[in-house]
Amino acid sequence: FEFVILDVLNPNYEKIDSEKLEKLVKENAVALDIRLDNQWKKTGVIKGSFQETAFDINGKFNVYLMDKIRALAGAESQEIELIFISHDGKTAEILGNAFAEDLGFTNVYVLDGGIQSWIDSNKPLEKYN
């Protein structure tokens, strides 16, 4: 059994570092921290970010995530600059691709390395209650 890779598609989202995340948030991008509640409490959260869990502890998708994004973005939700933040960046990449490819969002970003890269860059975090 043999197969040939004809093409490798680049993701429809952009991986960004901590510096670019700070810049985009200052320019009113929506930074959405999609980790679990216990993770927010453990590490804290990025100032200016919004918290909405994407998947529960059992891996079930949060069906209210789109409602949260629409509430934050308003009528032009697909054109907002949307940044996903996860623990290590992997879950954010999955959502980033889905929002860009399947839902038509045009300005999707993922914090490369997730909250851990933010911590490793010695960036400040706020306590989450």
Label each residue range with its predicted role.
Residues 1-19, 24-29, 37-83, 87-129:
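Rhodanese-like catalytic fold shared by cysteine-dependent sulfurtransferases
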Residues 32:
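Active-site flanking residues adjacent to catalytic metal/cofactor-binding acidic residues
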